[in-house]
């Protein structure tokens, strides 16, 4: 386009005409990238206007206690070599394994998710009718079922790494999100009695400190296996927790505030 329009004025006019002609195509590209791109974003190097910002941010999980690594020794045997009557193996290796209690953190940018799924402006999400927020509510509802119940699948054959979350906290608000990772600035010792209960207590203590410093600005609900008191929060089952969030997003306000 620049070669065809060397003059700045004609180039500007050509770009404006191109954008006008391609406006519907660009909108279709943004709206037609599928659920995965709506959740986790998409980068298109050939057309930056077709890129999409992620609506879900996932932090790297870390253990809340001192890590202890074990070496797992294993060999890979060459069956053909053995059948030939020779000694040896195709490889001798070891892998490092660690079993820990992890803290994970996930943020869902609801306005961005609605914008990605519905093709609306993120800043206008609160004024949209419930029908425009319904799909996003259902997506987050399903996501909330997946986060605590689906484990990473690496080395499944030799470790069976399947587990469900023991504590799940959901906070909803319009402030910038904030992690509770600072609760574990000082890692728990491995010999800590009642390790899981101690970790949850550290989280609730951190919540109390943040509330005291910044005020209670978030609606929160939680799931827990153990007896725990979370400041300004109600305990729910996973199904009720996911339904609460879905209703919150669809209505645009806390379900408890709707008469």
Where are each of the predicted segments found?
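Basic polyanion-binding and macromolecular-assembly surfaces
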Residues: 1-259
């Amino acid at each position: 386009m620049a070669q065809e329009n060397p003059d700045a004025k004609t180039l500007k006019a050509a770009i404006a005409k191109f954008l006008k002609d391609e406006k519907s195509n660009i909108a279709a590209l943004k709206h037609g990238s599928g659920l995965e791109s709506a959740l986790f974003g998409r980068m298109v190097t050939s057309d930056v206007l077709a890129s999409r910002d992620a609506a879900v941010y996932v932090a790297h999980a870390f253990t809340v206690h001192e890590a202890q690594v074990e070496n797992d020794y294993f060999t890979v045997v060459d069956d053909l070599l053995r059948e030939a009557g020779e000694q040896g193996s195709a490889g001798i290796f070891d892998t490092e394994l660690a079993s820990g209690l992890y803290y994970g953190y996930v943020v869902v940018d609801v306005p961005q998710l609605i914008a990605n799924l519905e093709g609306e402006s993120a800043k206008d999400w609160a004024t949209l009718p419930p029908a425009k927020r319904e799909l996003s509510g259902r997506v987050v509802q399903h996501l909330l079922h997946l986060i605590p119940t689906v484990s990473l699948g690496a080395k499944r054959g030799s470790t069976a790494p399947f587990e469900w979350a023991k504590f799940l906290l959901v906070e909803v608000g319009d402030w910038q999100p904030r992690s509770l990772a600072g609760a574990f600035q000082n890692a728990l010792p491995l010999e800590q009695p009642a390790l899981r209960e101690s970790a949850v207590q550290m989280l609730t203590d951190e919540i109390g400190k943040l509330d005291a410093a910044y005020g209670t600005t978030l609606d929160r609900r939680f799931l827990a296996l153990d007896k725990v008191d979370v400041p300004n929060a109600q305990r729910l089952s996973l199904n009720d927790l996911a339904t609460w969030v879905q209703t919150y997003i669809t209505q645009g306000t806390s379900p408890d505030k709707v008469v």
